[in-house]
Amino acid sequence: MPKVALYNQNGQTIGEIELNDAVFGIEPNKHVLFEAVIMQRASMRQGTHKTKNRAEVSGGGRKPWRQKGTGRARQGSIRSPQWRGGGTVFGPVPRSYSYKLPKKVRRLAIKSALSSKVLENDIVVLDQLSLEAPKTKEMVKILNNLAVDRKALIVTDELNENVYLSARNIPGVKVVAANGINVLDVLSHDKLVITKAAVEKVEEVLA
């Protein structure tokens, strides 16, 4: 089982914590991580694109000029796609791009993401994270104590309003509850700052 240092909010090492091998100690599967990120990014797409086809554009149904005798190419409608202002053929329509990967694959992906953070030594485990009031200054101080000076994902056992409000104005820092942890967030942040209670909650679900 991988062991990592356990810190307090002052950045002091107060012990060690053993992480579950089945969650934090597997060989990261890069292909599964790729598939999970693509799935999440696809679900984030708006899908509100739309073009008008020849039935929807403005213009009458009258034939622009007679079939023969003008010397011009024959035309049946000013709404044809080759006309300026004509309808689009096979244009995009509003749709949802979201899809789901199998549950086993999604679980393997999040385990791979967490294990990669342990392998790269980019995980910081806190005994607890609590603030008496929402103070951005206090959160910056805690992160400085922990030597976290890059993009960081903070994971708590449940969403703490004071922690969330204190971190939301810090560039590159995001706070999520343990039940909302996902592959894209873990991989797109350089450091994973997670509380001991959140580790237990994640292990309970994924182990």
UniProtKB/Swiss-Prot annotation:
Entry annotated with the keyword Ribonucleoprotein: yes
Listed GO MF terms: rRNA binding; structural constituent of ribosome
Domain of life according to the entry: Bacteria
A Gene Ontology BP annotation from the UniProt entry: translation
Entries under Gene3D superfamilies matching the protein: 3.40.1370.10
Assigned GO CC terms: ribonucleoprotein complex; ribosome
Span list, region Disordered: 44-85
Keyword tags: Ribonucleoprotein, Ribosomal protein, RNA-binding, rRNA-binding
NCBIfam families: rplD_bact
Family recorded in the similarity comment: Belongs to the universal ribosomal protein uL4 family.
Quaternary assembly: Part of the 50S ribosomal subunit.
Purpose of the protein: One of the primary rRNA binding proteins, this protein initially binds near the 5'-end of the 23S rRNA. It is important during the early stages of 50S assembly. It makes multiple contacts with different domains of the 23S rRNA in the assembled 50S subunit and ribosome. Forms part of the polypeptide exit tunnel.
Name of the protein: Large ribosomal subunit protein uL4
Gene source species: Geobacillus thermodenitrificans (strain NG80-2)
Organism phylogeny: Bacteria, Bacillati, Bacillota, Bacilli, Bacillales
